[in-house]
From Swiss-Prot:
One of its GO terms (cellular component) is plasma membrane. The keyword Cell membrane applies. It is found in: Cell inner membrane. Could be involved in insertion of integral membrane proteins into the membrane. Belongs to the UPF0161 family. PANTHER family: MEMBRANE PROTEIN INSERTION EFFICIENCY FACTOR-RELATED. It comes from the Bacteria. It is a peripheral membrane protein. Keywords: Cell inner membrane, Cell membrane, Membrane. The keyword Cell inner membrane applies. This is Putative membrane protein insertion efficiency factor. It holds the Pfam family YidD.
């Protein structure tokens, strides 16, 4: 009786197509254009890493809006520093109010008692506090 599970697996794969297409575009950017212009993001994780994680966690619609807001904040007069993808989508967000998925100002920094930058000049590692 494996036929029903195969059917649901196929449906799940089709429903993941937009998410995978968005992540594929980010992968393409990270391996073509990003090396040419340099790795110089104002945030940790980088905007492409943030976008990939947001779309992986929340899908193309919600994750795409989160990524758009992050890209608009990543400019000389915007934010910088640690900006993590939220653990959960905002409770006030709805598919027909997509701007509510995103944080348009400030950063999603980890709580001070969870982690802090290692102080080694690179944000590649976080050390527990």
């Amino acid at each position: 009786m494996q036929l029903p599970s195969r059917g649901t697996d196929w449906i799940a794969q089709v429903l993941r197509l937009p998410r995978n297409a968005g992540r594929g575009l980010i992968w393409l950017y990270r391996h073509t254009l990003s090396p040419l212009v340099g790795y110089n993001c104002r945030h940790y994780p980088t905007c492409s890493m943030y976008g990939d994680e947001a779309i992986r966690k929340f899908g193309l619609w919600a994750g795409g809006w989160m990524t758009l807001a992050r890209l608009l904040r990543c400019q000389p007069w915007g934010t910088s520093g640690i900006d993590l993808v939220p653990q959960t989508a905002p409770s006030r967000a709805r598919w027909y109010l997509p701007w509510r998925y995103a944080r348009w100002r400030g950063v999603n920094a980890p709580p001070p008692d969870v982690a802090e930058p290692c102080g080694c000049g690179s944000h590649s590692q976080l050390t527990p506090h």
